[in-house]
Regions:
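Conserved alpha-helix/loop element of class I SAM-dependent methyltransferases that forms part
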Residues: 21-40
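C-terminal lobe and adjacent flexible extensions of AdoMet/dcAdoMet transferase-like proteins
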Residues: 195-202
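A short SAM/SAH-binding and catalytic strip from SAM-dependent methyltransferases
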Residues: 107-121
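C-terminal alpha-helical "lid/dimerization" subdomain adjacent to the S-adenosyl-L-methionine
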Residues: 4-7, 11-15, 19-20, 137-195
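A short glycine-rich, Lys/Arg-flanked "PGG" loop and its adjoining helix->strand segment in the class I
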Residues: 122-137
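A short acidic, Gly/Pro-enriched loop at the edge of an enzyme's catalytic core
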Residues: 100-108
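Class I SAM-dependent methyltransferase SAM/SAH-binding core
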Residues: 43, 49-97
Length: 202
């Protein structure tokens, strides 16, 4: 299981495809909401089975999908290959080592449904900053800080444990401490919010 891997972030196990795809019927819309644009060089951090990676690759110049779970990366690789997408590299590794794993500098780092499980958020934010171009962006999609019982799909509670969830304010504080500046806070219905940060030009 992914959760048994050294360095795996708590509460970020890849869910079954059925409810995950029901939760995210329009991944391209989510990406547009947080500012992923055509022609960018994008890193999909903690990419899982590639549900968002595929949509990123359809518009990006180049994508690097990074996950600690090699099995999930193979699922993602197969997903993109079936769609005829060839502009993605798949890299197994620890998210904290992002600066060593992703080509630099990049336009955008995308992280969905994983930041709540990161033990050292400052360290991760600093690693992201190192990989971005000046004025590059870091987009985080997080579960709202609501009781798990209130975030149901197909009639069952979904998502991380209630105690792991972060408010937008907590997320913003953690990432700004790593040297990135908030540029956008958006709703990502039905149960998420998105926060976007920029690396300063200097």
């Amino acid at each position: 299981m992914s959760s048994d891997l050294p360095g795996f972030f708590e509460g970020t196990e890849m869910p079954t495809a059925g409810w995950w795809e029901a939760l995210w019927p329009d991944p391209a819309g989510v990406l547009a909401t947080v500012g992923v644009k055509p022609g960018m060089d994008v890193t999909d951090l903690c990419s899982g089975d590639g549900w968002f990676t595929l949509q990123i690759a359809k518009i990006a110049r180049r994508v690097v999908a990074i996950d600690i779970d090699r099995n999930l990366l193979e699922v993602a690789r197969h997903r993109l290959a079936e769609s005829g997408v060839t502009n993605c590299d798949f890299v197994a590794g620890d998210a904290y080592e992002l600066a060593k794993l992703a080509p630099r500098p990049g336009d955008f780092v995308f992280l969905a449904n994983a930041f709540h499980g990161v033990p050292d958020r400052l360290r991760l934010a600093q690693a992201v900053r190192e990989t971005l171009k000046p004025k590059g962006h870091f987009g985080v999609v997080n579960w709202h800080q609501r009781p798990r019982e209130e975030t149901s799909i197909f009639g069952e509670p979904r998502g991380p444990a209630t105690e792991l969830r972060l408010s937008p304010e907590e997320t913003i504080k953690s990432i700004e401490a790593g040297g990135l500046k908030l540029t956008q806070l958006v709703e990502v219905p039905p149960y998420h919010y998105g926060v976007v940060f920029e690396r300063s030009p200097s």
